[in-house]
Amino acid sequence: MTGFDCWIMPTFRLASVLNFKIQEIKIMKYIIVGAVAGGASAAARLRRLDEHAEIIIFEKGEYISYANCGLPYYIGDVIKDRDKLFVQTAASFQQRFNIDVQIMTEVIAINPIAKTITAIKSPTGETYEEAYDKLILSPGAEPVRPPLPGVDIEGIFTLRSVRDTDLIKGYLNRKSARRAVVVGAGFIGLEMAENFHHLGLQVSIVEMGGQVLAPVDFPIASIVQQHIRSKGVALYLNAAVASFAKSGEAITVSLNNGKQLTADIVILSIGVRPDTRLALQAGLKTGEARGIWVNEYLQTSNPDIYAVGDAIEFKNPITGISMMTYLAGPANKQGRSCANNIVLGNVQKYNGSINTAIVKVFDLTLATAGTASKHLKAANIDHVVSTTHNGSHAAYYPNAQQMTMQIAFSPIDGRLLNAQAVGYDGVDKRIDVLSTFIKQGKTVYDLAEFEQAYAPSYSSAKDPVNMAGFVAENILMERLKIFYWNETGNIKAHDLFIDVRRKDEYDAGNIERAINLPVDEIRSRLHAIPKDTNIFIYCEAGLRGYLAQRILRQHGFDNVFNLSGGYKTWKACTDESVLIARAG
């Protein structure tokens, strides 16, 4: 008798004695609606957790699991090979994961009592029902196409799917397009503007708001706007499209300010809305933001139906306000968590998204995490904002590039609430660090202690993340009093306004009413500075202003304020404000 026999036989005898019977395991049937980000992620995870389940995924389009974030770059010929856009095909997904993939098949109804769905096949129109044990909704969002006069003219497109991409690409190949108008200056709008520019088109951007990229604050957006203009792209802010009209082979785009633009192709990139039609038909609860309501386990108001992706809403972990999150990263992670909860029994809580996002705008990179200052104000959340300008790596090592970073934090405990960064190099790795700090509820004191990998070609001994923490720490410890670019007009005639840069810098450009007193001369001229008035100081980026402030404060000058972000921030913001005002 082998050792194995010695071990196994008593086990079977014990089972026999106890009259043990192996119970038949119920084979579960999972149905998923939507096969792009969240849906495909959920399907693959379900299979990894449950090899024996029956899994059916429905996709009304022709393609599944594609890289929708890469679509603008395929249009712009940055991505040459169309096949690179597809993470999986229906056939490869089905073969690898043993999942029944039903493409060109739209789920049109849910019967939550009978636990069935009704689907319709294209192009035959055949309808049929499928039963389910658990259902996952991942219907995504639909692009907004406003009911404007002429909006259905040939050559006006939205971009959301591979089909949209093929239509745009085909149109460009058929037409000799020279001029493009992009309506909307969000992430997709700016990416499309860049890619049209890459194709050699003359590009105009029309944006109803007063800045590009609504998730960030104006001081950061102003840097992006200047960069866009430097590329020869026309930018029309505070402008809305009133109508479209055909003018021969061209399209006339009429704005509400009376201006008219001529285009050969128009992209509408003015936002998306959650696709909640199925959820509403099934009687599922929707929320304050009009998305599908889910609990912390991504479970809808029906316990057998879960939902993920662009169609759901969830409370923002910073503001507590229900919101939509139209980002691929959270959607994919939700799909995985949802599958865990279905198979393992609600074991993984979803904590919401802080909307960490990044976008390439020509040579520039902008990234954000958390809740912007303007949205914190709208939510009545008290906070302080500070801005720093630093190099992407050590200044003495070649090719260091400027990076501007703005953070928002609690004045009570220093908890980090938002981070925004813009620059040419290293923005991505800094925002990932800052996003982690925000997500974990860390403070600006933690930023000051952040330990990064350092070599002069990669960073500085005091990384830009550290510098942001140092400045915020000084503000909280009341070693640094600040004022902002849009408050310079509030400085009174009897206040003292000092530019502490060198004379040549001052002569090259300064803020009206400021006198020049270089920081290195302050100690020798203390006798000439009155102590009974407010003193407002600025330098190029903020550091020399801080040094001047510390000198004055320790010589008995109490009311000394330093301009956050310095002349760089003031200049970018005021220049853009003037351009916007003139255009309006």
Residue ranges and their predicted role:
Residues 34-37, 160, 185-186, 541:
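Glycine-rich Rossmann-fold phosphate-binding loop(s) that bind the pyrophosphate
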Residues 26-28, 35, 39, 48, ...:
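Mid-to-C-terminal Rossmann-like scaffold of FAD/NAD(P)H-dependent oxidoreductases
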Residues 86, 179-180, 187-245, 327-331, ...:
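Rossmann-like dinucleotide-binding cores of NAD(P)H-dependent redox enzymes
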Residues 137-199, 234, 288, 294-296, ...:
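Glycine-rich dinucleotide-binding loop and its adjacent helix/turn
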Residues 52, 96, 102-123, 130, ...:
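A Rossmann-like FAD-binding core segment of flavoenzymes
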Residues 10, 445-456, 460-486, 490-496, ...:
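Rhodanese-like catalytic fold shared by cysteine-dependent sulfurtransferases
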Residues 26-102, 193-216, 349, 353-356, ...:
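Beta1-alpha1 glycine-rich phosphate/pyrophosphate-binding loop at the start
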Residues 152-176, 248, 252-254, 259-340, ...:
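FAD-site-proximal beta/loop scaffold in flavoenzymes
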